[in-house]
């Protein structure tokens, strides 16, 4: 079917140039069955969506099951709100046993949500507090630990600029806006921003205040060092803690939060796209950052209990020390012999050119780009008429 539709699309390209009517492509079985499926689902207020195909059919055609699984999702259909719980497909769980308890956890959460609702309450958020209010919050004696998170305008922590920083506990979070998503706007007057930074410096240097965060011992640490000139301590990185608890599973905060809390899908939208990179307003980004902090604070106690029950305290200390070394190595960098690098670059570029010429000679296509999946697809399956390997036994 795909091969036939590719041929139709090629023909339509020429027909458009010739001013002729285009030929409709052949619909897939999923597209043919979609109207009936939607009609059958219309009477159900609660849906368990197992696997990517089910998530695409019930939530959004671009939905990703790994980005949405375990996250309670509400969809508006025909004036009604439908509750959908995306879960891994049972076949995947049977093949990959490490997902078994994740699958059971998602089902348990779905049953609770469908029957009585979830008990997760969003944190109370204070946006852009004054220096005085921020200091009062960060010096409260009844708080045993704080979690924090930063949002930036880039992925590389040595060059990224900080947009906001959030600090808090499971139910209360303060978000300090620094740089607008437009790259120019600020949230404090210059003199007040200086005061805010001084309060934050005192907080991060206060050894009596335990700090925690997800990947905070690496990315967030380097951002804070570059921005404030201080190293946060003492610090617990929940990503390292979860690595000891469940070494074979993903360690992203979205995954950990979906497993240990009843929070909705705050990391991604319904299409599975990360909100950290796609927020349209400063408020959306700041709210996202606040949720990161609250959920990190919520999962930390249970993760630490599991580490203690496994007697992994020595391992977690070792992991944090290694992380410190890695962060310092990233900051310092390494010496590069530029003369030798340039020599190796020339050798590799010549090898690439020679291989490209050889490939084009073999294929008889002087314009072939070996890095183009589209061109290779047409070459392998249209021109050479090869059969794509469907099973492991067919691979050569």
At which residue positions do the language-model features occur?
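Metal-dependent phosphoesterase core characteristic of DEDDh/y 3'-5' exonuclease domains
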Residues: 59-71, 84, 88-94, 168-170, ...
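Short, flexible loop segments at the rims of nucleotide/cofactor-binding pockets, characterized by
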Residues: 23-31, 122-129, 184-193
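Conserved "right-hand" nucleotidyltransferase catalytic core of DNA-directed polymerases
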Residues: 109-186, 218, 248, 260, ...
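A polyanion-binding, active-site-adjacent surface
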Residues: 1-118
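Hydrophobic "anchor" residues on beta-strands that sit immediately upstream
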Residues: 85, 145, 210-211, 233
């Amino acid at each position: 079917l795909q091969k036939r539709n590719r041929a139709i699309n090629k023909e339509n390209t020429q027909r458009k140039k010739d001013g002729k009517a285009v030929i409709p492509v052949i619909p897939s079985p999923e597209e043919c069955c979609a109207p009936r499926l939607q009609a059958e689902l219309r009477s159900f207020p609660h849906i368990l969506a197992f696997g990517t195909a089910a998530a695409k059919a019930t939530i959004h055609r671009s939905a990703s099951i790994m980005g949405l699984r375990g996250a309670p999702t509400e969809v508006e259909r025909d004036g009604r709100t439908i509750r959908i719980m995306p879960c891994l497909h049972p076949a995947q769980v049977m093949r990959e046993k490490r997902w078994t308890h994740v699958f059971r956890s998602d089902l348990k959460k779905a049953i609770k949500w469908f029957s009585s609702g979830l008990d997760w309450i969003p944190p109370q958020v204070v946006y852009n507090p004054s220096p005085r209010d921020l200091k009062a919050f960060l010096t409260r004696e009844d708080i045993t630990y704080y979690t924090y998170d930063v949002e930036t305008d880039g992925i590389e922590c040595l060059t990224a600029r900080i947009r906001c920083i959030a600090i808090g506990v499971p139910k209360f979070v303060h978000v300090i806006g620094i740089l607008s998503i437009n790259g120019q706007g600020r949230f404090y007057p210059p003199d007040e921003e200086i005061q805010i930074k001084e309060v934050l410096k005192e907080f991060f240097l206060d050894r009596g205040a335990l700090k925690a965060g997800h990947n905070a011992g690496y990315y967030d640490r380097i951002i804070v060092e570059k921005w404030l000139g201080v190293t946060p301590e003492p610090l617990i990185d929940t990503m390292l803690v979860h690595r000891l608890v469940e070494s074979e599973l993903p360690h992203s905060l979205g995954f950990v939060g979906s497993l240990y809390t009843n929070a909705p899908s705050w990391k991604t939208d319904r299409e599975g796209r990360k909100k950290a990179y796609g927020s349209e307003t400063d408020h959306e980004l700041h709210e996202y950052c606040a949720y990161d902090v609250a959920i990190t604070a919520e999962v930390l106690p249970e993760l630490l209990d599991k580490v203690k029950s496994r007697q992994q305290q020595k391992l977690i200390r070792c992991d944090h020390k290694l992380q410190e070394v890695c962060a310092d190595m990233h900051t310092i960098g390494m010496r590069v012999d530029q003369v030798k690098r340039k020599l190796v670059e020339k050798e590799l570029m010549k090898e690439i050119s020679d291989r490209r010429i050889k490939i084009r000679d073999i294929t008889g296509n002087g314009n072939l780009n070996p890095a183009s999946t589209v061109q290779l697809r047409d070459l392998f399956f249209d021109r050479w008429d090869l059969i794509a390997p469907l099973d492991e036994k067919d691979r050569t």
